[in-house]
Amino acid sequence: MAKNIQAIRGMNDYLPGETAIWQRIEGTLKNVLGSYGYSEIRLPIVEQTPLFKRAIGEVTDVVEKEMYTFEDRNGDSLTLRPEGTAGCVRAGIEHGLLYNQEQRLWYIGPMFRHERPQKGRYRQFHQLGCEVFGLQGPDIDAELIMLTARWWRALGIFEHVTLELNSIGSLEARANYRDALVAFLEQHKEKLDEDCKRRMYTNPLRVLDSKNPEVQALLNDAPALGDYLDEESREHFAGLCKLLESAGIAYTVNQRLVRGLDYYNRTVFEWVTNSLGSQGTVCAGGRYDGLVEQLGGRATPAVGFAMGLERLVLLVQAVNPEFKADPVVDIYLVASGADTQSAAMALAERLRDELPGVKLMTNHGGGNFKKQFARADKWGARVAVVLGESEVANGTAVVKDLRSGEQTAVAQDSVAAHLRTLLG
């Protein structure tokens, strides 16, 4: 007997019971995006490897340790996308969407990182990302955060997430801060773990993000990034904070929030939660005003964020059990008798024409009434439409409300109107 082939570790199947809740959550997210005027862009999952090295940074964990990179038959180095921003910027440059234009874009799909699988963190994971190009003021940063807050309210999780903000300033301000931070870390090198020692010279701001408690205690005495900000970045950040306060969105300034990718500047933010056991990031982003030019385009201001859908689904299920998947079926068409199946299928097609958007399933595979009604219950149907030989003969159907048990004989021409009333 042949050995079963299993899914790759950290790359999961999502079965029908799971995808139903995903679809409802994704539908909620997309409705909010539409209400803000954002447009979908669809991007390849494979890009040239240099795109990510230039965008994310050669000495980041993503590029050094986590990318799925391979050589194709032409000898080109290709990578499964570890994030979406770089590909979105590449597409914008390639298709002339960015220079002197305003774009509000979103995308959704799988990303890939070779890291240790754990709850809410997988090697193939799904993100929804938003990217805005051509706007440089703090008002668009605030709009993106307000958009995410509207998501949390719609999903019933607003009380379970907290907004953390920071400004990491301009490239020049970060260079000055980097020098001061490295000088401080060199004085306390014996207190650093091996990972922080490695990062100290390659990407010292990432030391601020260390999860080591001893390093975090040391950093209490380190220079503060906020003391090195340029005046424009200070004004930008103050403007953002004022807009959020006016919108009633609470936030915490976290001066150690730097994000893990090199392309950010000025605003960075994260929505975090403690409702999944340990603190976890649900959604994160910031400004990346230099990335378009860095990837070969004309200088264009930009800001965006990405949200991990696996972690969002876990959070919704943990704190809002009333947020359930929509039923697979609204109406189940029961047919019994030797000559009723073709009539039942014809009636089903007519009802689909007259009731667009309603989910109707026709019984197949035979079975008596008891078995067919059991199938209707299994699929979550609210209403059954019943056709027997006598109903076919006299042009009627029985419509049964499966919640109340009430049933009515209705002329087939009137079934759609009757169902419309029952389903509301």
From Swiss-Prot:
Protein name: Histidine--tRNA ligase
Family affiliation: Belongs to the class-II aminoacyl-tRNA synthetase family.
EC number: 6.1.1.21
HAMAP family xref list: His_tRNA_synth (MF_00127)
A GO term from the CC aspect: cytoplasm
Organism of derivation: Shigella sonnei (strain Ss046)
Lineage: superkingdom: Bacteria
Location of this chain's protein in the cell: Cytoplasm
Pfam short name (any one): HGTP_anticodon
Catalytic activity: tRNA(His) + L-histidine + ATP = L-histidyl-tRNA(His) + AMP + diphosphate + H(+)
Coiled coil: none
Main location: cytoplasm
Keyword line: Aminoacyl-tRNA synthetase, ATP-binding, Cytoplasm, Ligase, Nucleotide-binding, Protein biosynthesis
